[in-house]
């Protein structure tokens, strides 16, 4: 949520800042601003409410702002309404300190009251202005030493934050600090870059540094210096980003989401290949040994949003194949419950960005209680990747659309591979069955491509449903997990009210919501539950529902019940989520397109939720 881009070097800063901010639009925002300084001159600040193009128009695409040092920001309102006044950057009373901030300062009112007593005045409703003026207060108190000033402010701020600060007394320099909010540093040919995420600076450099929690950075004269909370210098090594800038472009597709849907065969294949060696699953890169796999008596899966839906699907697969008890929790609930945890348990935390605030907090809680932790993440060097005991990296590449598709699919693959290996090591499946499962996994990319090649039928049907008022997804067992993700895709990008229900629960209240014309989508990939779900669909139809069925090739008798049916290739039933979710992603996408909505940046949503 929110985005920060900063630059100091030899080129004009403002166009670079605007370009970087455009690569962070997927994070969600309601206003934007720039602060640029030209040598010894005072910093110029320009802000605009609304989309980034308004800021670009105000600054002639950045060319109207002279200067080679600057900070930029896209704001997601938390404290104070969306407005130019509340937009970042913010400044101290005398303009000596200028800064931007991501995150939430929990004790901002307490700090604000302190500063009011010290004679400070406030022009905005934001917690960011409080942080900037707190730094200014300590800067004056500790005799013009930026590192000490920021250090003292960090000690007193409670909450999560990433800060980029410029000081009038230090032209050409930028100071950065973070706690529980992501920030990266890039260096190339004497130029220094700061960003909330890699795509913002990938056009300029692939050499990045990840700032640790409660660390600070000084960028000056083409070099970066890292400090700990005590103000002592620390050494860091850069990380080389493997993917290129083109991977974060639309490549001819109308939307990033459609591009990323079509990238799923490759993303799934790449993630599989990362752990498949000589026809077997090799988890050495993950760091889990066979002895450890045998020792776990319980698995906890913790995640948010679509990653939580991955967890629900993987629960079924792990329990079925490995006969291992699995508990799935929303990270925002897990972290606040005082529940007993099995000391021999494994806590799996799933997060595309590796920075999801609640998931990161849940990981830290699990580690504090002494449990082994495993992160399934897509971003190398992210907070969860650094702090988890073990990491399974998905190879989805950059995912720009807010609604996840390929990251979700690669997370499923990670879960499948863990489940299959657990099952073999624990003696729950034979070697022959193990090889069969791996063969089925290797078929998934081609099967996903087959579904994508036949997407026109889904596009046609979706256009007819653009005016739907309610959509209900129903399924049993693993099909319920699929329904959860299908429903989320529908509601988050088409703004149609949608819910997913375990089909067996319909009679316990939900069926009262069914009326003439209500679209009900039944998911039926599990053969043992097929007839029961058909019966539930018939119950809905008798109350006026319009039925769509989603099942595997061969189940053609569903056409006696459903008015429209989508078929997916047959696979091992425990892997069916990977195929059945594709038509539901396309359904949500095409409904949104038919309604003329902003598919990649739906209202009120952010790609990476880095605040609680």
Regions found by a protein language model. Name each.
Residues 1-254, 263-295, 336, 431, ...:
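Conserved short alpha-helical segments that host acidic/polar catalytic motifs at enzyme active sites
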Residues 4, 99, 165, 176, ...:
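Structural beta-sheet core signal
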Residues 68, 72-85, 275-291, 314-350, ...:
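Glycine-rich oxoanion-binding loops at beta->alpha junctions
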Residues 127-130, 310, 314, 410-415, ...:
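Catalytic-loop motifs flanking and including active-site residues across diverse enzymes
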Residues 264-268, 272-300, 390-519, 592-612:
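Active-site phosphate/pyrophosphate-binding segments
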Residues 294-443, 523-569, 587, 595:
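Glycine-rich phosphate-binding loops that contact phosphosugars or nucleotide phosphates
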Residues 546, 561, 571-612:
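Generic C-terminus detector
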């Amino acid at each position: 949520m929110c985005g920060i881009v900063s630059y100091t070097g030899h080129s004009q800063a403002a166009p670079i800042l605007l370009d970087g901010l455009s690569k962070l639009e997927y994070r969600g925002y309601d206003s934007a601003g720039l602060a640029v300084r030209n040598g010894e001159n005072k910093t110029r600040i320009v802000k605009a409410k609304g989309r980034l193009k308004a800021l670009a128009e105000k600054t002639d695409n950045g060319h109207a702002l002279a200067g080679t040092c600057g900070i930029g920001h896209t704001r997601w309102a938390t404290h104070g309404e969306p407005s130019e006044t509340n937009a970042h950057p913010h400044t101290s009373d005398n303009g000596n300190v200028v800064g931007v901030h991501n995150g939430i300062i929990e004790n901002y009112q307490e700090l604000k009251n302190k500063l009011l007593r010290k004679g400070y005045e406030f022009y905005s409703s934001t917690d960011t202005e409080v942080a900037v003026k707190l730094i200014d207060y300590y800067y004056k108190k500790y005799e013009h030493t930026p590192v000490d000033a920021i250090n003292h402010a960090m000690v007193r701020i409670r909450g999560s934050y990433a800060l980029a600060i410029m000081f009038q007394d230090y032209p050409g320099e930028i100071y950065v600090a973070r706690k529980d909010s992501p920030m990266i540093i890039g260096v190339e040919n004497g130029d220094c870059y700061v960003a909330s995420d890699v795509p913002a600076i990938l056009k300029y450099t692939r050499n990045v540094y990840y700032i640790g929690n409660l660390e600070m950075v000084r960028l000056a004269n083409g070099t970066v210096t890292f400090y700990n909370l005590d103000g002592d210098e620390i050494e860091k090594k850069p990380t080389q980003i493997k993917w290129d800038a083109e991977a974060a472009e639309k490549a001819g597709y109308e939307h990033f989401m459609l591009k990323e849907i079509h990238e799923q065969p490759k993303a799934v294949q790449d993630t599989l290949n990362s752990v498949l060696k000589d026809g077997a699953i090799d988890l050495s890169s993950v760091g889990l040994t066979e002895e450890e796999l045998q020792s776990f008596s319980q698995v906890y899966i913790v995640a948010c949003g679509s990653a939580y839906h991955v967890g629900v699907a993987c629960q079924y697969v792990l329990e079925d194949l490995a006969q291992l008890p699995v508990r799935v929790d929303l990270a925002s609930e897990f972290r606040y419950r005082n529940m007993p945890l099995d000391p021999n348990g494994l806590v799996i935390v799933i997060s595309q960005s590796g920075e999801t605030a609640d998931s990161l907090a849940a990981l830290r809680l699990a580690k504090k209680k002494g449990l082994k932790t495993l992160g399934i993440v897509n971003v190398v060097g992210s907070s969860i990747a650094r702090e988890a005991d073990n990491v399974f990296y998905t190879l989805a590449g950059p995912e720009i659309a807010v609604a996840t598709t390929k990251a979700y699919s690669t997370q499923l693959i990670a879960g499948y591979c863990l489940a299959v290996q657990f099952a073999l090591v624990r003696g729950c499946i034979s070697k022959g069955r193990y090889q069969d499962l791996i063969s089925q996994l290797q078929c998934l990319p081609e099967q996903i491509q087959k579904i994508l090649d036949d997407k026109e039928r889904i596009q046609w049907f979706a256009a007819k449903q653009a005016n739907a008022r309610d959509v209900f997804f129903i399924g049993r067992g693993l099909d319920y997990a699929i329904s959860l993700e299908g429903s989320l895709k529908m509601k988050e990008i088409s703004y149609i009210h949608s819910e997913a229900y375990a089909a067996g629960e319909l009679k316990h209240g939900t069926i009262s919501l069914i009326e003439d014309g209500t679209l009900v989508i039944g998911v039926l990939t599990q053969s043992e539950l097929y007839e029961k779900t058909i019966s539930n669909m018939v119950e809905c139809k008798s109350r006026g529902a319009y039925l769509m069925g989603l099942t595997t090739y061969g189940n053609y008798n569903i056409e006696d019940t459903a008015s429209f049916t989508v078929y997916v290739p047959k696979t091992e039933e425990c892997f069916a989520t990977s195929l059945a979710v594709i038509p539901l992603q396309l359904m949500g996408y095409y409904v949104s397109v038919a309604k003329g909505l902003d598919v990649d940046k739906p209202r009120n949503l952010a790609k990476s939720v880095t605040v609680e």
